[in-house]
Structure formats: C-alpha cells, structure tokens
Amino acid sequence: DLHLGYNIGCRHMEKMVEKINAQNPDLVVVAGDIFDNEYEALENPDRLAAILRGIQSKYGVYACYGNHDIEEKILAGFTFGGKEKKESTIEMDSFLEDAGFTLLRDEYVLIDHSFYLYGRPDYERPGRGIDERKDPQEITADMDLSLPVLVIDHEPRELQELADAGVDADLCGHTHDGQLFPGNLTIKLLWENAYGYLRKENMHNIVTSGVGLFGPNMRVGTKSEICDIMIHFK
C-alpha cells in the first residue's frame, strides 16, 4: 500500500527505494493501493516514476491493483464518491509502466522457469475492463503445480480457497494493521489474518501494514513497513 497522492510523495518514495535496494531483493511486489484514489494528486508524476524506476531487483517489480486504485476525488483524506462503479484509469496504467512496474490484472507470469506469480484484481473494485475476477481454482487451472505458485492479492480474502487451489504463498495488504489505535485491535475481528503471518494448510499468507496511509496522515500503535520475505523452494 503506497497510497501515492496528497500524503505520500517523492520524499517518501526516495526513502522507500533506498530501503528496498538495501535488501538486495530477487523480486519486489506491491499488493495494491498504489494510488490514493486521485491521480491528479500525485506530486510530480514524472519524478515519482523516475524514483520508482530506481528499485533494483533480479526479477523485476510486479503489482496488482487495490480498492483505492480508482479515480475518485478526495477531501480531507477521505473519499466522498457516489455508488456508481469506479475504475482505474489509463493514466494510472501508464504511470506504472513508466515506473518500471509490471501490472498483473488477473494473469500470471512464469519467472525464470522456476515459479509462478499471479496478480489478482481487487475483490471489491476489480478495475477497468474486468467485471468479475477469476476464482482461485481458475487462476491455477493451467499451471504446472509442481512449481511454486505465489499470488499477490490486495485484500486477504479467500484464504482457504486459495490453499485448496494449490497456491503456496498469498501476499496481501489493505488492512494497514488498523493504522490508528484502537483499530489495530479491532481489525482482528474483521479478517482471518489482519496482519502478519498465517499458515493455511500448505499455503503461507502474509499481510503487510504497508508503506502509505489512508485518511489522516498519521499512525498510532502501528508502523509503516517494507516486508522482507525469505522464501525457500523445495
């Protein structure tokens, strides 16, 4: 969750890229909410994209969209849109391409002939051109399940279904770990895994609190983070 916009801009991304590169990652994934609803709120999009292009990883940077990756006006940190369907924009897609991100929209890539990475559209707002996202069984239907399957999905939903479909790791965001106390306590009532690590049979689910913020520009009782994951394939 970067939530690029009024609260998060170039200075934050410079620090983030520096910290990511210090980990010497093989793969970088962003599990949605790259934007904070309003594309026009980006601080100098060209410079932001150039900063993000500085992320260094062996296999590249991949992303999926979240429920805030849509065009919707913001006031005082919150959205006040109607109930009509809202979608991602071509400008958002182009920005990610300029930033060196590969956007996965209900599709997968086979990386280094060694493992699959699948990017799911958001459960609530799947985005432009997608009416309903594929179910877990569909996303692995034509995969060689002798190879590891990694999924990026903005919201930590359908965990049992993903495990049943043969997914090995499900990487999520969305919850911000509650962001503000006591939200970090009550959020646990809403999600099977609201933050951190959960093993679901043979599947590993990891939910990060994210880098950015939604609403008020603060955290109380939680921390922004970059999640460094070590995965060993057997």
Q: PLM features: what roles do these ranges have?
A:
Residues 2-234:
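Soluble catalytic domains of enzymes that build or remodel membrane lipids, polysaccharides, and related
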